């Protein structure tokens, strides 16, 4: 649903409340939740639904760090704040258990993210990470972890304007405590801790629509093991198709086809880093990495095996011409006697010099050169993911993905991912979708951020 549709829905909700003299008891549970979220976000420095942006920039000016409150925000008596030390076994284990048991599930409660300790080490400990930005809420009496939110440092660039920022992620509250209004207090507390470090902006994403997305992308799925996906209910058998036909449709070549494609090593970092930075400049919303961040996000380390996979293509002169990466984040399969886990690969960042000779990204020849090259690269990535026992490969409609999604048999998913900026007002950025939410191969996306 687009911003205008959600704005209209909220307007109807407000009118209903006015007719009933503000009596929320006449609202459904879902309507009450939507209204509470609306009330909270109305107090925050975020863009409003349908707001006309005349000048892009910060909503509130930076404050003095010494003016930020020193004390954490008060919790209900039975809870207490806890800074989570994920370098130690028990805190990492507690975060691991909380998210695996309570984080995002699909609507039918059939699949749930299966986070690994290695994934958390990669996602939560980039260069510059701070322990105090891993915020937990424990039950005072038992010590049980019941809520978590995190921030990691990043540098954002919005239409060429750079700002020190954080990426907010992994907001999770125990299922039985979701009526306790912990989410707003978690957001306020992580904001306080980040402000204490003289950072006033944040990037975050959500499947739900809040005030107000800067960009919206759609999830897409490319089956690698169609038979297993069908067995567990991830995909259905289309009308007028047989299982044999579906298996044939999604069969990939036995080995990668791009000449010279190989795993990226530390020796490739300089060339890949330069290529990546030049490629990213075409987008209106990006994260900029320094070289140590680039190494972390694309090579990982001994704490993060089997999480991030990066590949390069080097020409005969030793120049890196292509770079592509994906990460692994499996699903736990609930209520299925045959399968316990679904292997999932996620397209991360990539870059190619295929269209660098053209000033205009949308020049027809440049577009065709890039489309052909990306199609070859991502097809090989699907083969590599299949060989790593992944069952499906996911991508958003961000970046230049709309050029290859249809040709490579990525199907549109049910889910959309909305991107938000905290304390920054900007005009919407294309997310690779047409008005009717189809892949927009003509205009593509100007959204160049991939969030975990």
Curated annotation (Swiss-Prot):
GO molecular function, one term: glycylpeptide N-tetradecanoyltransferase activity
GO terms classed as biological process: protein localization to membrane
Key words, A-Z: Acyltransferase, Cytoplasm, Transferase
Gene Ontology cellular component annotations, sorted alphabetically: cytosol
Reaction catalysis annotation: N-terminal glycyl-[protein] + tetradecanoyl-CoA = N-tetradecanoylglycyl-[protein] + CoA + H(+)
Binding site for tetradecanoyl-CoA: 38-41, 171-173, 179-183
Cell location: Cytoplasm
Top EC class, one word: transferase
InterPro entries (UniProt xref): Acyl_CoA_acyltransferase, NMT, NMT_C, NMT_CS, NMT_N
EC nos: 2.3.1.97
Keyword Translocase in record: no
Active site residues of this protein: 452
Pfam families: NMT, NMT_C
Chain segments annotated as transmembrane: none
Subunit structure: Monomer.
PANTHER family assigned: GLYCYLPEPTIDE N-TETRADECANOYLTRANSFERASE, N-MYRISTOYL TRANSFERASE
Family to which the UniProt record says this protein belongs: Belongs to the NMT family.
Function: Adds a myristoyl group to the N-terminal glycine residue of certain cellular proteins.
Protein name, per record: Glycylpeptide N-tetradecanoyltransferase
Lineage: Eukaryota, Fungi, Dikarya, Ascomycota, Saccharomycotina
Gene: NMT1
